[in-house]
Regions:
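C-terminal engagement/docking regions of AAA+ P-loop ATPases
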Residues: 234-319
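Pre-Walker A (pre-P-loop) alpha-helix and adjacent loop at the N terminus of AAA/AAA+ ATPase modules
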Residues: 2-47, 230
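Conserved AAA+ ATPase small/helical "lid" subdomain
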Residues: 195-250
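Walker A/P-loop
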Residues: 33-70
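P-loop (Walker A) phosphate-binding loop of NTP-binding proteins
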Residues: 44, 78, 146
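Canonical AAA+ ATPase core
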Residues: 85-90, 111, 115, 123-215, ...
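Conserved alpha-helical scaffold flanking the Walker A/P-loop in AAA+ ATPase domains
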Residues: 28-31, 84-104
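Walker B catalytic acidic pair
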Residues: 43, 106-107, 118
Length: 319
């Protein structure tokens, strides 16, 4: 396990060569990929969202495709289509852009709802269904989507059903002064990507994902996650609390956090460290809470503060 743990950390080091000054963002995305999750990256244009996704594909030696989501992108561009071949008298399937290990959906909230919905089965089942035939996608498979803040020209809010399928949502933010100086010194931008070297491959990632699945989680930690989720459902400031899928995402990310920390068991701090990244994009304020100046960040902090934490102790079986 230790050897693969070090490989995962080596990936974050390589990605950080192209995405300067954002080690926490890079680490959270690595956790999501280890937990078989999909990632939503939200921020204004020009802060390196696309570069981040490309750097991960390069460092992990994954096949990857990118689609710029515009209003004229069709579902068939994403999932593929069948074309009749006159010579054989049969329909032949032509794979879409998601037939890869890492699919980058760039500016996902600029396209139509119909095209966005084409991603739902892809993200949940890692498969596409075209003309009644379901085809599995290559493994490992991750959707990494970028979106501009709602309110930007030409954007629309993603539906809750799609947001819930993203394991985490991370915000890039502006680089600090030193990082921005280095970005300017290394123009054009591909000069930053050229620094990233492959340090593992898809088989390594599949092995790591299996190891993360095997990280031990006690009943006390599971109960803690359930109580956190229930607290959001019972909070009167929220119109929409956390779903059971969100609880599963918290558990998966907590296992990945423990794995990257070199532990074979989940501790309470693993849950609290990732809770906001997993839950922020899933929660919806009531109109009254919004007009009253309440924020999702405050509610998450309240939930973490008021929900009793299990005592941090190593499992008795010595794992």
């Amino acid at each position: 396990m230790q050897n693969f743990n070090e490989k995962a950390l080596a990936v974050t080091a390589e990605v950080s060569k192209a995405v300067l000054g954002k080690p926490e963002v890079v680490l959270k995305i690595m956790m999501a990929m280890l937990a078989r999750g999909h990632v939503l990256i939200e921020d204004i244009p020009g802060v390196g969202k696309t570069t981040l996704a490309q750097a991960f594909a390069r460092a992990m030696n994954l096949t990857h495709n990118r689609v710029q989501f515009t209003p004229d992108v069709l579902p068939s561009d994403i999932v593929g289509f069948s074309l009749y071949q006159k010579e054989t008298g049969k329909f032949v399937y032509h794979p879409g852009a998601v037939a890869c290990n890492l699919f980058l959906a760039d500016e996902i909230n600029r396209t139509s709802a119909r095209t966005q919905s084409a991603l739902l089965e892809v993200m949940e089942e890692s498969a596409v269904t075209v003309d009644g035939v379901t085809r599995p996608l290559p493994q490992p498979f991750t959707v990494m989507a970028t979106e501009n803040p709602v309110g930007s020209v030409g954007t629309q809010m993603l539906p809750e059903s799609q947001l819930d399928r993203f394991m985490v949502c991370v915000v890039m933010g502006y680089p600090d002064a030193e990082a921005e100086m280095e970005i300017l010194a290394r123009q054009p931008r591909h000069a930053l990507l050229d620094r990233v070297q492959p340090v593992m491959d898809k088989n390594d990632l599949l092995t790591m994902q299996q190891q993360v699945d095997e990280v031990f989680m006690s009943d006390e930690i599971r109960r803690y996650i359930v109580e956190l989720s229930r607290a959001t459902r019972q909070d009167g400031r929220l119109a929409l609390g956390l779903s059971p899928r969100a609880s599963l995402a918290v558990a998966g990310m907590a296992r990945a956090a423990a794995y990257l920390s070199g532990r074979s068991f989940v501790a309470p701090q693993d849950v609290t460290a990732i809770f906001a990244d997993v839950t922020h994009h899933r929660l919806r304020l009531t109109e009254q809470a919004r007009t009253g100046g309440e924020t999702v960040e405050n509610i998450i902090a309240d939930v973490l503060h008021t929900t009793p934490r299990p005592r941090p102790e190593k499992p008795s079986h010595g794992r």
